[in-house]
Amino acid sequence: MKKIKTIIIILISIILIIIYARFIATSGLITKEYTIYSDKLPYSYNGLKIVHFSDLHYGSVITSKRLKQIVDEINLINPDIVIFTGDLLDKSLKTDDKLVETISKQLKSISAKYGKYTIMGNHDYEENKSEIEKIYKNSNFTLLNNQYDIIINKEKDKIYLGGIDDTLLGNPDIKSTTSYLKENNDTYSIILVHEPDYSTNILKEQEVDLILSGHSHNGQVRIPIIGALYTPNGSKKYYKNHYKIFQNELNRCSCIFPLISIHIFFF
């Protein structure tokens, strides 16, 4: 009888842990702020605010109501640049025109002085790729697929922003993405790549100042003190919030920021 009681207690504990991990631990919205210093940034960009979020997987934990909360929180920060680093929809989600319109409308309401940028994640290639691209277009997010943009403010000072295609299911091309930096390496540079472990490949090819990633969910299965028990492929080495690599910055985001500084906010 005592043995049966013990088994029942263990089973109930496991069920409660699963419920907590699936529905409670994933429901809170936490904003983390980092200040990044660089003497490569022109003075006119002092205090630049970047909001970085990733891996919404809309349709699983994230609902329309939840997305509105995230959008409202982003707009409260009044960001200069907004960056989303892939995996927009849950791969099991069945999409239609109404859903595309709903998500597009919410993401379009995000305001950013210098623009909104995104890249593709591995789940974006598995299902709903065309719908995801349509959402980005409708919501005024610039999709950087082995491409880059040069942000220029009213003082004509520049920041380079490049986005690399997904490294697991896409066709990443570091050379074409970073071609501008070969002749302009004094420009402050930001690279977006969904899988953080690919940062090593990027830095072997080209020196950059800041890399923003997603994918790892800060350790997919994680126990306090012990740390991550499981991380997805592409985030085995780098899965925490912030790393310094060769004096460069790698900031990865879990789904859910007198040298010049950038303030980066993570969700």
Annotate each predicted stretch with a short phrase:
Residues S44-T142:
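Membrane-embedded segments
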Residues K134, N138-F141, Q147-Y148, K154-V193, ...:
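Binuclear metal-dependent hydrolase catalytic cores centered on His/Asp/Glu-rich metal-binding motifs
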Residues H57, L89, H123-D124, Y148-D149, ...:
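Catalytic metal-binding/acid-base residues of hydrolase active sites
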